[in-house]
């Protein structure tokens, strides 16, 4: 399962671009960004799950606003997601070197952000 990075500094347009291009199903973010998803998710219908960082304080009103705007979403803390994984164990599927690991979006300084495809072998080769 590849991960996709997106800079929150790119604003709604940059986020919509990366979500549309990758058809992401899940997004991880810090809780202060929850309401920043409301408008982009009107245009990008693939997101089904929102997981927020458990180590930061969350405003429950922000969760409610997002849920009200997009009732189809499952919104969880990272701790809740971890617990669900512990309760529903599956056999690991190790990636192959040629499998896509990450789509890393550029900052978009010269226009629309571009997604750089990194395979698992690229990430391993870059490790110290």
Where are these regions (language model features)?
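Structural core segment of the AMP-binding/adenylate-forming
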Residues: 2-80
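Alpha-helix capping and helix-loop boundary segments enriched in small/acidic/polar residues
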Residues: 6, 10, 94, 114-121
């Amino acid at each position: 399962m590849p991960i996709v990075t997106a800079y929150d500094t790119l604003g709604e347009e940059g986020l919509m671009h990366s979500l549309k291009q990758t058809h992401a199903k899940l997004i991880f973010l810090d809780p202060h960004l929850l309401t920043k998803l409301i408008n982009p998710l009107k245009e990008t219908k693939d997101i089904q799950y929102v997981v927020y960082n458990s180590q930061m304080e969350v405003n429950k009103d922000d969760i409610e606003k997002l849920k009200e705007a997009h009732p189809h979403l499952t919104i969880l803390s990272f701790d809740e997601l971890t617990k669900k994984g512990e309760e529903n164990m599956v056999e690991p599927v190790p990636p192959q070197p040629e499998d896509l690991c990450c789509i890393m979006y550029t900052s978009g300084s010269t226009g629309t952000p571009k997604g750089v495809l990194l395979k698992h072998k690229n990430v391993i080769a870059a490790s110290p």
